[in-house]
């Protein structure tokens, strides 16, 4: 799991890890990515690292391609956490470098037109959208019987 939200990184806090060195440090210094273990078996995190002045510039470099290749040697599946598509160009820039993008939509927060705009931005950047997931959806009490 790679924290590519270089403007507002959060995975280090979520998993109680050291923030640095991380993704940007590996890119800027051409060093091995500092993967950190978590309490979740077989889950390794590469934190965002040092905040760069312009994240989109870093995400667009060939060094990111090289880092992705190095990570592919270490893991079967790599997930990149990126900032919102509509807010900054970072997700579209990164999305063009990976196999596919999963849009994460928040129930009751993400407006339909924002989701549609995000889809348009990614399609314009020739990013493969593999799907979407809805978070924070309320639990329907009628479904509880199914799991009982």
Predicted regions mapped to residue ranges:
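P-loop NTP-binding module
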Residues: 1-148
